[in-house]
C-alpha cells in the first residue's frame, strides 16, 4: 500500500543486517514478495565488541549470501518479478563525474551537520566526536582548516586506495567510518572496502548477464 501511494515518486525500503541475521538475502526476498520494488539492505557498522558487529571471520558467509542474492535477483528480474537492489546498481554507460569518482564522501566539504545547539560537524556521524567540531552557526565561527582537510580527503591522498581495482566506483568510502575504525579519515575501514568490492563484483556480473540476455 505504501509503495502504491508513492505512485511515480521514488522511494527505498531500507533494512540493516547484523551478525544476528547473516541470511539477509531472505529479508530482501521477503520485502520483494511484499510488493516493494526499491530495496536496500545495509551492513551494520558497530564496534567489534558489540554482539551485533560484523567481523572479518564472517566475510565468507556474507560473500556467499551476496552470491545467493545475486542469483535469485537475476532469476526474478528475468521472470517478471522485477525489483531493484540498491547495492547492485551500476551505470556502465554514464555514471558519476570525475570528481565523484575521485571523492565519494562529501562530509566536511560539500555538506556539514548542525546540532540543535548550533554546533557544526563534518556530518551527522561525527557529531560529538572530540576534535571534529568545526564551529557554530550562532557566532559565525567556522574552522576552514578542517574544511580543507576534508575537501582534500580523496583517492589521491589515500595510499591504500591507489592500487584498489574498485576505487573509482566507491571514491574512497566513508570518512566517518574510516576515522572510527582506523583513527584517520585517510585510512578506509577494511570491512567496508571488502563488502563494497564483493557487491560491485555481483553488480558487474548482473549487468553483463542482463545485457547479454537483452542482446539475444
Feature names for model-found ranges:
Residues 12, 68, 117, 160-163, ...:
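Generic detector of isolated residues embedded in canonical secondary-structure elements
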Residues 4-111, 115, 130-133:
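Radical SAM enzyme [4Fe-4S]-AdoMet core and its adjacent flexible, acidic
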Residues 127-216:
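Flexible mid-to-C-terminal extensions adjoining Fe-S/redox cofactors in radical SAM and related proteins
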Amino acid at each position: 500500500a505504501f509503495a502504491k501511494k508513492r505512485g511515480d515518486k521514488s522511494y527505498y525500503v531500507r533494512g540493516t543486517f547484523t551478525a544476528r541475521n547473516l541470511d539477509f538475502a531472505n529479508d530482501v526476498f521477503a520485502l520483494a514478495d511484499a510488493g516493494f520494488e526499491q530495496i536496500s539492505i545495509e551492513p551494520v557498522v558497530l564496534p567489534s565488541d558489540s554482539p551485533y558487529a560484523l567481523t572479518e571471520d564472517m566475510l565468507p558467509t556474507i560473500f556467499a549470501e551476496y552470491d545467493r542474492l545475486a542469483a535469485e535477483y537475476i532469476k526474478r528480474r528475468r521472470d517478471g518479478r522485477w525489483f531493484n537492489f540498491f547495492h547492485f546498481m551500476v551505470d556502465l554507460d554514464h555514471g558519476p563525474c570525475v570528481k565523484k569518482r575521485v571523492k565519494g564522501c562529501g562530509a566536511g566539504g560539500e555538506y556539514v551537520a548542525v546540532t540543535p545547539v548550533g554546533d557544526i560537524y563534518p556530518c551527522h556521524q561525527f557529531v560529538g566526536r572530540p576534535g571534529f567540531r568545526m564551529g557554530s552557526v550562532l557566532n559565525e565561527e567556522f574552522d576552514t582548516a578542517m574544511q580543507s582537510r576534508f575537501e582534500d580527503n580523496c583517492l589521491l591522498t589515500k595510499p591504500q586506495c591507489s592500487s584498489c581495482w574498485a576505487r573509482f566506483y566507491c571514491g574512497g568510502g566513508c570518512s566517518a567510518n574510516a576515522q572510527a575504525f582506523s583513527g584517520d579519515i585517510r585510512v578506509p575501514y577494511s570491512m567496508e572496502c571488502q563488502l563494497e568490492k564483493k557487491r560491485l563484483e555481483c553488480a558487474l556480473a548482473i549487468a553483463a548477464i542482463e545485457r547479454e540476455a537483452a542482446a539475444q
